[in-house]
Amino acid sequence: MVKVGFIVEGDSEKVLIESAGFKKWAGSQGLEICSPVINAKGGGNLLPHHIKPMLAQIERSQPDHIVILTDLEDAADVETVKARITTEHTNLIFIAVKALEAWFLADTDAMRRWLNAPEFFETAPEQTPGMPWDRLKEVAKAHGSRGPGSNKVIFAKKMCGVALRYELDRAAAHPACPSAKAFRDGLVALGGMPWS
């Protein structure tokens, strides 16, 4: 097994990486998720001088690779974010375009379960007019479902839990969610096992 340490932007990303479903998927790819998953508590903390103490904490688990997962939020493009947080100690930096919630929108099966709407399909989860969190509220209202609530972490736990069963593979398979695909493919490459 290839040991992978994670530094994530916030609580929702931490929920995803620590979820049983994600760990099971990672194991099937020859990856072991190191503990703890480090929460930077905001994209502004993902700067080289802030990352060094986080790296010291994660290196106790002796990872083979260190991965950073963050959101684009309002940055101009992915390269701007990478340039801001690049450090020689991390192997891969992945950016969820706009926000992690776009990946939830891209998992059609989990969204259909949440909305109880078998016809649901989000055509452009990474190109929502506003932030993906706002889009989740809109689609819930349009389908007469309860919204995601006011707490992103609670919603992330619900999406990644046993009832809705969010899966990275399904989000990555969405034709308009290239950031989830890049994340999945990058992790698969680290594990060295052929993607199935």
Language-model-detected regions and their locations in the chain:
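RNase H-like, metal-dependent nuclease domains and their acidic two-metal-ion catalytic environment used
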Residues: F6-V8
